[in-house]
Amino acid sequence: MSDNMQIDSPSPQEIDEGLYSRQLYVLGKEAMLKMQNANVLIIGLNGLGIEIAKNIALAGVKSLSLYDPKPVSITDLSTQFFLSESEIGQPRDVASREKLAELNSYVPINVVDNIDEETLLKFKCIVSTNISLEEQVKINNITHANNIGYINADIKGLFGQIFVDFGDKFTVIDQTGEEPLSGIVSDIEKNGTVTMLDDNRHGLQDGDYVKFAEVEGMPKLNEGNPHKVEVLGPYAFKIKIDESYGEYVKGGLYTQVKVPKDLSFEPLTKQLAAPEYLISDFAKFDKPAQLHLGFQALHAFQTKHQGELPAPYNEQDATEAFRYAEELATQNPSILGEDKLDEKYLKELFYQARGDIPGVVAFYGGLIAQEVLKNCSSKFTPIKQWLYFDSLESLPSETEYPRNEENNKPIGSRYDGQIAVFGKAFQEKIANLKVFLVGSGAIGCEMLKNWAMMGLGSGPEGKIFITDNDSIEKSNLNRQFLFRPKDVGKNKSDVAALAVQQMNPDLKGKIDSKLDKVGPETEDIFDDKFWTQLNIVVNALDNVEARTYVDRRCVFYKKPLLESGTLGTKGNTQVVIPNLTESYSSSQDPPEKSIPLCTLRSFPNKIDHTIAWAKSLFQGYFAESPESVNLYLSQPNYVEQTLKQNPDIKGTLENISKYLNNRPYTFEDCIKWARQEFETKFNHDIQQLLYNFPPDAKTSTGAPFWSGPKRAPKPLEFDINNKDHLDFIIGGANLLAFIYGLKEPNATVDDFKKVLEQVIIEPFQPKSGVEIAATDAEAEEQANNLSGSIDDEQIRKIAASLPEPSTLAGYRLTPIEFEKDDDTNHHIEFITAASNCRALNYGIEIADAHKTKFIAGKIIPAIATTTALVTGLVCLELYKVVDGKDDIEQYKNGFINLALPFIGFSEPIKSPEGKYNNKKFDQIWDRFELNGDITLQELLDHFEKEEGLTISMLSYGVSLLYASFFPPKKVKDRLGLKLTSLIKEVSKKEVPSHVKNLIFEICCDDEEGEDVEVPYICVKL
């Protein structure tokens, strides 16, 4: 045994939320703490082994140990991104250790010098790759008997195999990782039928469990015991209750309860004979059984040939391996059942057995690492028990790239693993691609690593362009694995480019990294010349707006686009091919449900509502009001200008008056301000609401006003010993001091207490005539009335009370920009406190800063495993794009959820077809192309004569250049103008010099005089 195992180190430290922030939102604290107690061993440090190790190290287990004494060879460099030519001959595990250790300082990386039983028993989970079937059985017999998780995985070219065994009894605490469902009850019948309020869907399934709270008339139901659900429909479910539960009066909330589930796994020896498969592609339902025999046949071949696999595309070797598959099928006929062995399909596996494809490695590496995390944390449902996969559609066309023993033999290159599958000519094609990667965050880093292994862009004609205008933050390090702690603050694209050039020196000088955001404002940088040189565009973005823009450019320049995204354990990939598929923008997600205005202002019933209210309060206090003050101080005629645009001018001016006439001069003043605001928001405003709508108020129909989603609030009495009350004061005072540029003393809690004791609070006086909207319709009506009833006299009065800007020359406030990831800036502290105080008003369960940050910061949960997997799938599509496949059935859009686990594929949707005058056109990809800066008359004549179309309207951007209903003189004046002159005359702007294409939209009639939809016009200057 080596002495550096550190297996019995003390219990894990607290979770570093700065580092693991995004992953915590995927796994939760409980699962993370379990992982930090788990020791993991990886046997086999080829490309797949290192990919799994990388993902596990980033995720944060207690320790990660490696075993692979085999010496490094040149072919390892096909996918082993932490090895280089200088390490050839060294043991793989020793050579990989240091680079793995850099990924996460919380995870010690050890090398073990044997894998006897004593060593294996030290681990919670063991992964093996690339070992003999005999060794797998030996290891699994030990792990199964001792309840140690065991995963074996193998990759052969475009094929892959996973086996999972987590022992006789493995408990899954949370099968899906989804937030527990909850809702408001409108009725519970005596037979146990529960009905939802206001046609809200409950989303539950048969067998789910729920608990209840706040049900009036049924105290026994509120005791918190889980009840099993029988679904009656989308708006009702049934639970078992008897007469002892009492009779329903009103109210009630239900919340789903996650019930642990026990799973039982069989050892490898049993599963070899009677396998249980997870299907990865429903179009290949019969393939797992074929591959189950095929992979065993390869082990039989290796046994006969001293561990050697069949040579690439060697017919003799493939025939021998197929013979072993036939013998296995005869020995165990139940595996194939009625089916026959598919010789053509299995020979493809044998031909490719020495292949090592970066895309398959990334896909499987993400998948397997997530299985390890499931074993260590008991969170999410594991694979039972085999998963087979192939991506034969990625093979290039036989006619252009023939695959045979000569073309696919190794050439002593780092790309031999890829050449073994695709051949030398296709490898050259990959090397000479020009590819644009938009974004170098989590997906971008993984993509670049895959491309470095593929040799993409490394040839004489090749080039990789990257752009990202973001810099590296600590929370990125947990999944953007090309970055290290020393890189925090640097530009993502530059650091990523340097990192992959070290992985593959062939990329030196082949990467052009930019810091520019891709958008309309940078079309002079990403111009015609830039776009036309590209072969493929790949998105690695995290927002819809940027994705849509890149998609539009790809459609315009007719460039293939590979798109992907992740959300926690969910991921998707989409391939967009010119003149074949629809584009990214063709389909859209449904819009997010917004919180009704009256719910936000007066009737919250969920913590999400109070967090949204608190974020809005933060923006109002510390961003919008200071910005209004600065505009007033810097803009002449501010009041007159604002009157025209802002219906709530009165509220805006009152705020400016408060911020200038009552400005604080000391930090003590800031504390007093925060205390007064506490009283206003959490006491007086609540008392006013109850004055307008007393607890016993009734609606116009005689029903109780405070029922259903409306919860009657209680005013808060300030309590200095309540953490949320005090945090509101501390956060508020510090933020106010910041906007006024006051020095913030390092005030202690005692300092705050001293000042707070001196604050005099006026008692609440109810105001009559205060309108509070009880419904959204009322809120909308009030907003409309606001814009229609501006009281000039009142506004003049407030405006007159404002100090003259000239008396405050040069004086400005500093508006605060919300930043969620800095725990020292009081932003999240203040929002959490404000949200929790409001939750206390309404009897809603409060949330910690971690949850508040997630909702207020709109954080996208993320984990390295999903990212790796998704980029692997993208690279498998990339091979198809390089080959120029024009059969839509060969392409796959991927949909995965590692938590379930679910892997599904579908064909892309074909681009829609349009028609005019019996001519067909592609509604997405086709356009009318004209050359030269012609006149408007020439353009109209061309369409009349060549296309049989009479143009009735012509527009450029937002400018209408021509319409048949224009006055004759206007039309006459414009017909003789060149298009660029016409644009200048109408829009009052020159066409920028970098613009080489003018895009016009038209409305027109066909030969029958009917209005028809046609493509846009592109005029090349």
Curated annotation (Swiss-Prot):
Keyword NADP recorded: no
Positions bound to Mg(2+) 2: D542
EC number: 6.2.1.45
GO CC terms, sorted: cytoplasm; nucleus
Active site (UniProt): C598
PROSITE patterns: UBIQUITIN_ACTIVAT_2
GO biological process: DNA damage response; ubiquitin-dependent protein catabolic process
Protein location: Cytoplasm; Nucleus
Pfam families in the record: E1_4HB, E1_FCCH, E1_UFD, ThiF, UBA_E1_SCCH
Pathway: Protein modification; protein ubiquitination
SUPFAM superfamilies cross-referenced by the UniProt entry: Activating enzymes of the ubiquitin-like proteins
Superkingdom of the source species: Eukaryota
PANTHER family, per the entry: UBIQUITIN-ACTIVATING ENZYME E1, UBIQUITIN-ACTIVATING ENZYME E1 C-TERMINAL DOMAIN-CONTAINING PROTEIN
Note: There are two active sites within the E1 molecule, allowing it to accommodate two ubiquitin moieties at a time, with a new ubiquitin forming an adenylate intermediate as the previous one is transferred to the thiol site.
Family as reported in the entry's similarity comment: Belongs to the ubiquitin-activating E1 family.
Summary of subunit composition and partner proteins: Monomer.
The protein's name in its UniProt record: Ubiquitin-activating enzyme E1 1
Phylogenetic placement of the source organism: Eukaryota, Fungi, Dikarya, Ascomycota, Saccharomycotina
Chain's gene name: UBA1
